[in-house]
Amino acid sequence: MIDHQNPDGSWYYGTQTHHRWVDNFHTGFVLECLFDYINFSSKFELRSNLKKGLEFYQDNFFLADGTPKYYHDRIYPIDIHSCAQSIITLVKLDSVSEQNQELKDKVALWTLENMQDSDGYFYFQKKRFFTNKIVYMRWSQAWMLKALVTLLISQKEFTEKTSKDRVGTSHILSTS
């Protein structure tokens, strides 16, 4: 994987010539896998590859308002899987970059405001002139459930940790 990282920090979808694009969720998968590999193998010399990849991700896959882009070089389509994977990746790599804190919240808020129907389900894709509102359980709903649960768990852990640090006890926030 390291040998296939581009000089700008990105990774192509695949090694074949017809796979020469860079997309949000596959980049997120790669970043998460690299993060885990570094942590489980203690190959800390690969942290520079992770940081370079994460910087590319942060700089190229998001608009200022938190809109997650499908491809690094264009806005549309905006796909719910990109929204979900963005949240998951930014939460997981929270310790790598402080920028992730604000960005994950922006992405989550943008997604809830722009990709969620008033009935609660999430849209499949927003294109330039229309929105595909088909309900796909695996592609849309399941991934957003995973993303939102991941975000909520990270916020709960953060709140518990900061409460413990400030007060000196971990039982301040009780779930009962």
Label each region the model flagged.
Residues M1-S176:
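Glycan-recognition and catalytic cores of secretory/periplasmic carbohydrate-active enzymes
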